[in-house]
Amino acid sequence: MRVIDGGVTAPKGFKANGYKEGKFGVAIIISEKDAVGAGTFTTNKVVAHPVVLSRELIKNRDKFRAIVANSGNANCFTKDGMEDAKEMQRLVAELFNINEDEVLVASTGVIGRKMDMNIIKDRINKVYNLIKEGNSSINAAKAIMTTDTKPKEIAVEFEVNGKTVRVGGIAKGAGMIAPNMLHATMLCFITTDIEIDKESLTNILQKVVDKTFNNISVDGDTSTNDTVFVLANGLSGVNYEECGEEFENALLYVCRELAKMIVKDGEGATKFMEVVVKGAKTEEDAVKASKAIVNSLLVKTAVFGGDPNWGRIVAAVGYSGADFNPEVVDVILSNYKDEVYLVKDGIPLADEGTEELKKAEEIMKSDEIKIVVDLKMGEFENVCYGCDLSYEYVRINAEYTT
């Protein structure tokens, strides 16, 4: 497997482009033939209208031709939101001469504001004309940005019996990131030219989302609009049964890299952190403990301040609900070059005036840090990704709708 250019347009038979002016943008991804579709969505009880619409579409049909997404308005908690989401479907279907039910819809932006459909129609028409002229995955990625500071895209390919399979993706997200998608707003659209059935694609996607997007945190909020779509059009000529493990690894890589990009672009973020909890008695314990650490506001602010306050880490594990014996735990801090034990076998090492504390303080100056907690209770492990919480985060969100 190798990384290539092209994002969602790298796989055969996919076109994409986007247009944004001011706060309002639209991206469209289109497949030249029917593509098997799968998706996962927010578990927030307040659900945006495009999520309701697309969730039903995914539930009731197997194949799709297009994805349309707008930025600047979440189309959530509004009187005419469902009609507006369906109008987006209709506009795209009419331009590309496909059925309305073949169009999946997503939105991101401010909650509770009515969509200005004149703006949406203008943007959709502009993107249609751009797609006729050429492909631009990066333009599509830029069009769905809200508080993001940079577009997020990636693509990979691998060989199977002389044929090439490609997987590409774009994503957006910088705030309201603590996805929990069983079936900033976090949007991710993935394309692939592998041939695969809906059941297999759905199962693989859920497994991958659990390992990636459901393990990231910027601010601990779960959006009303979180969505991941995958379209697979089969144009590589390679069936999933020929390369199951390779395809899963490719999809996992794409989603993990996009998840990391989202975290690194977290609103006001200055530092990236990887949290590994290992030695847990159960998988559930590993997940609980790692998420408690990565979501802890006290841990996030300590990371921002460069403070190796390991007490906040063990406190988070303690309230996580995971089975945990403080008398045996290890806590290790690293910057991927140097590492230091903050706690070993339940004994604090990074105490006032120690070499361990000095080393920890140097490590905390790095832009990327890794926290490893070994519970020594079993064999299970989970990895989460997060970022610090800065003054800038407060400013961005205090001024979001103004």
Swiss-Prot record:
Annotated binding of substrate, by residue: T146, K172, T185, E267, N397, T402
GO molecular-function term, one example from the UniProt record: glutamate N-acetyltransferase activity
Range of residues in the leader sequence: none
Principal localisation: cytoplasm
Lineage: Archaea, Methanobacteriati, Methanobacteriota, Methanomada group, Methanococci
Protein name: Glutamate N-acetyltransferase
Pfam families found in the cross-reference section: ArgJ
InterPro entries: Arg_biosynth_ArgJ (IPR002813), ArgJ-like_dom_sf (IPR016117), ArgJ_beta_C (IPR042195)
Active-site residues, Swiss-Prot/TrEMBL: T185 (nucleophile)
Reactions catalysed according to its record: N(2)-acetyl-L-ornithine + L-glutamate = N-acetyl-L-glutamate + L-ornithine
Subunit structure as annotated in this protein's UniProt entry: Heterotetramer of two alpha and two beta chains.
Keyword tRNA-binding recorded: no
GO CC annotations, alphabetized: cytoplasm
Keyword annotations from UniProtKB, A to Z: Acyltransferase, Amino-acid biosynthesis, Arginine biosynthesis, Autocatalytic cleavage, Cytoplasm, Transferase
UniProt xrefs under PANTHER family: ARGININE BIOSYNTHESIS BIFUNCTIONAL PROTEIN ARGJ, ARGININE BIOSYNTHESIS BIFUNCTIONAL PROTEIN ARGJ, MITOCHONDRIAL
Highest taxon in the source lineage: Archaea
Keyword Transcription regulation in record: no
Site feature: Cleavage: A184, T185
GO biological process: L-arginine biosynthetic process; ornithine biosynthetic process
Enzyme Commission code: 2.3.1.35
Metabolic or biological pathway: Amino-acid biosynthesis; L-arginine biosynthesis; L-ornithine and N-acetyl-L-glutamate from L-glutamate and N(2)-acetyl-L-ornithine (cyclic): step 1/1
Family named by the database record: Belongs to the ArgJ family.
Function text: Catalyzes the transfer of the acetyl group from N(2)-acetylornithine to glutamate, forming N-acetylglutamate and L-ornithine.
